[in-house]
Amino acid sequence: IPATKQSWISDCWDAVRSIKKSNNYESMILVIDEIQKISNWSEAVKKEWDADTFNDCDIKVLLLGSSRVMLEKGLSESLAGRFEEIRMSHWSFLEMKECFDFSLEQYIYYGGYPGAASLINDNDRFSQYIQSAIIDATINKDILMDTPINKPALLRQTFELGASYSGELLSLNKMLGSLQDAGNTVTLAGYINLLNESGLLCGLQKFSIDNARRKASIPKLQVYNNALKMVYNSLS
């Protein structure tokens, strides 16, 4: 995909329309992978989609991408109400059991990333894969490429500390004391929100009928996949 050529989307769309018309097809499917690599892709998609809607041209569109943050930004900016979001995250236990013969204990500890399944007998290689292919790729390419971050090192430290304490209550004030150049709790809360949007780590608030008490409670940090915690915590 040409990252700077927005017209490429329109060219693809016109080609599909031409094929549909010349073959008298009732409908067609247009699939574009890694759509987030094109600047202002959502504007181009909105333009072509609205044109098809106006002209009653039945072209179904499937947009794929590897950057959740960048995709959601484009969807929320220009395509609100025009799409259905289907998230493809890590695999379920049944999928890992069927494909890799994972036991429940293995799934709980090693998580559900299929690319790392063959490495579970070598902890060093497994940790290196999760670190480079999942953590580094998400933070460096998903978050930092499209989001202005004043302290990138602090963002990474926040994730590492949160992953280490996954499943435990950890107040933002306590995190401030453990991180270098942490700034304030507002900064940390913003970084945790970014990590949540990218599918790495979230902060779960204590359940309460009272919304004020729930929001004021100390969050329980939780990784989305236990493989992310395993990198920072040895097996015990």
Language model regions located:
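Short, glycine/charged-enriched secondary-structure capping and boundary segments
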Residues: 44-47, 76-80, 236
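Short glycine-rich substrate-engagement loop in P-loop NTPases that contacts/grips substrate
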Residues: 1-26
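Interdomain motor-coupling "hinge/lid" segment immediately C-terminal to the ATP-binding subdomain
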Residues: 66-68, 72-169, 173
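Accessory nucleic acid-recognition modules appended to NTPase machines
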Residues: 127-236
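Conserved RecA-like P-loop NTPase ATPase core
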Residues: 33, 45, 64, 96, ...
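Short, hinge-like loop/turn segments at secondary-structure boundaries
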Residues: 9-10, 78-81, 219-221
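Conserved catalytic/switch belt of AAA+ P-loop NTPases
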Residues: 42-63
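Conserved P-loop NTPase "ATPase switch" module shared by AAA+ and STAND
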Residues: 24-45
